UniProtKB/Swiss-Prot annotation:
Signal listed as a keyword: no
Domain of life: Eukaryota
SUPFAM superfamilies documented for this protein: Glycolipid transfer protein, GLTP
UniProt keyword annotation of Endoplasmic reticulum present: no
Record GO terms (molecular function): lipid transfer activity
Full protein name: Glycolipid transfer protein 2
Family membership: Belongs to the GLTP family.
Residues the entry annotates as binding a ganglioside GM3 (d18:1(4E)): D69, N73, W116, H155
Species name: Arabidopsis thaliana (Mouse-ear cress)
Amino acid sequence: MKRKRYEMEKKKKTEIQTAIEELSVFIVTKPADKTEATHIPLRPILSFCSLIIQVLDKIGPTMAVLRQDIDQNIQRLEKFYETDSCVYSNLAEILKKEKEEGTSKMVASCGRALFWLTRTMDFTAGLLRLLSKEMSSKMEELVEECYMTTLKPHHGWIASAAFKVCLKLVPDNKTFMEAIGARDESYDTLREDIDTLSSLLTPILKEIYFVLEQYGLSRLRSM
């Protein structure tokens, strides 16, 4: 009995289970004084995006372009954070600083990095929700459906064309399910984990979108 318990405790968590742990302690603080910035912790957001990269790595080289884009945006925010970790542990302070400097909408701004990371998280959450409800559907169909509502409205023709190419490289259901933990977990457990993650992530995304709107960064587009 003890051995079985030890083996269960030793069992490696999936990326989704790790994300649940990260986001379950995520707290957004809204100040009473409206002149102060809402406090949205930066590190858990970056940790979650890093977990997305880990899943993409498991899927293989077909996701290399998306992986690189996410990684570059994470690095951009981390670099800014390191200039004053006490102040910029709050992502709203980063947006506030860039707005004051007039750089928030520049190509290499943290504002743009946060916008696209948020869209990526929204896409990921949407895809997982669809997968939870329709595990028998083809991954290509689920990815395209989710893309149309989360990313396409902000993509220009170049980005949309690139997506169509990537869509042909989407892995099959089995490969993707194994990448997010189905190899060691039952589908019922995986579905429960997905639903838990979605319930945690949805209100967080809502708060981030609200802050992006405050700083005029909710309608950015790529080429």
